[in-house]
């Protein structure tokens, strides 16, 4: 199941000044919890998605680290070739000298000021470790030491069946995309971590499929429809209803039901079935978190070799290096 980032939002009445900058801040950084090279995250006002400056075939520019996309891509406006065609390119990623990319055009409202040179999707992100903090990212070819992360207060979320450097460990019919687990009332479900989904209009957006919507309603959760948003997908223009839930917090847990964080300010966005793949086409309940959820944690670490995602506690109390698509 391929999930390719091609979303855009109709918001003609909303305009944001978009500026961005980034710099490589070191060959290695001893404060990185899993080692690796440190990069300053590119600043995009109102955005939460992680952009870094990388180099592909000698061209340097902003790349989105998109854990919600299963395939990596390069800008068709920069690299020669028709949209959708494949290109093998050298890429400045740990342990990867060259990789296959498809050529694409990017229409997301929030992008760095220099534009977007490419997307690093899970076909490559599943091959190395990434630690994200508020202002930095650490890319490492090494796995993490679980005992060290537990000592720093991070909680492991096992990715068995969902996200791994070993494709044979992925469940049938599932993409290789990292997840957490959500609890709302009596309903518990897995949710993909979509770092490329800029939910800046409705912060803490949780996309849900029809199966999850039906289960929530059947369990007695009251969903109050507050608005609709327009989304362009590979299947054309879609109207998606946006809901609030009053009086019931949303809990983020690991696979063993250990609570990591609880919030009351969130939105549910119903994704209708389409031909684009992803949770909308699944018959079992499923969800997808917007990138603004990254801001809730002191650190987020994707460790595909250990088949684990690590989440720090609430950012204001977390201990870590940070302390020393639009909807």
What would you call each of these model-derived segments?
Residues 20-327:
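Pepsin/retropepsin-fold aspartyl endopeptidases
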Residues 1-6:
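Positively charged n-region of N-terminal signal peptides that target proteins for export
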Residues 7-17:
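Bacterial N-terminal signal peptides
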């Amino acid at each position: 199941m391929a999930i390719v980032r091609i979303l855009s939002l109709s918001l003609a009445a909303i305009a944001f000044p978009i500026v961005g900058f980034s710099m490589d801040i070191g060959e290695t950084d001893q404060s990185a919890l899993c080692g690796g090279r440190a990069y300053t995250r590119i600043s995009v006002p109102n955005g939460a998605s992680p952009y870094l400056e990388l180099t592909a075939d000698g061209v340097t520019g902003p790349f989105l680290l998109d854990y919600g996309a299963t395939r990596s891509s390069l800008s068709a406006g920069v690299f020669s070739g028709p949209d959708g065609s494949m290109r093998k390119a050298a890429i400045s990623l740990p342990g990867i000298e060259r990789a296959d990319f498809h050529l694409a055009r990017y229409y997301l409202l929030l992008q760095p000021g220099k534009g977007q040179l490419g997307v690093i999707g899970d076909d490559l992100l599943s091959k190395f470790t990434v630690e994200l903090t508020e202002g930095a990212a650490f890319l490492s070819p090494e796995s993490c030491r679980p005992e060290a992360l537990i000592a720093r207060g991070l909680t492991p979320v096992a990715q068995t069946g969902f996200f791994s450097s070993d494709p044979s460990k992925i469940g049938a019919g599932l993409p290789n995309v990292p997840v957490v687990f959500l609890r709302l009332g009596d309903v518990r479900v897995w949710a993909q971590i979509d770092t490329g989904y800029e939910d800046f209009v409705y912060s803490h957006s949780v996309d849900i499929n029809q199966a999850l919507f039906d289960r929530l309603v059947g369990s007695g959760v009251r969903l109050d429809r507050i608005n609709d948003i327009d989304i362009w997908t590979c299947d054309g223009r879609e109207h998606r209803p946006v809901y609030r839930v009053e009086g019931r917090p949303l809990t983020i847990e690991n696979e063993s039901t250990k609570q990591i964080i609880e919030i009351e300010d969130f939105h549910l966005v119903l994704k209708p079935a389409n031909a684009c793949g992803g949770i909308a086409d699944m018959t079992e309940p499923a969800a997808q978190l917007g990138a603004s959820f990254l801001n809730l944690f002191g650190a987020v670490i994707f460790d595909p070799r250990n088949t684990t995602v690590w989440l720090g506690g609430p950012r204001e109390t977390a201990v870590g290096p940070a302390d020393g698509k639009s909807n």
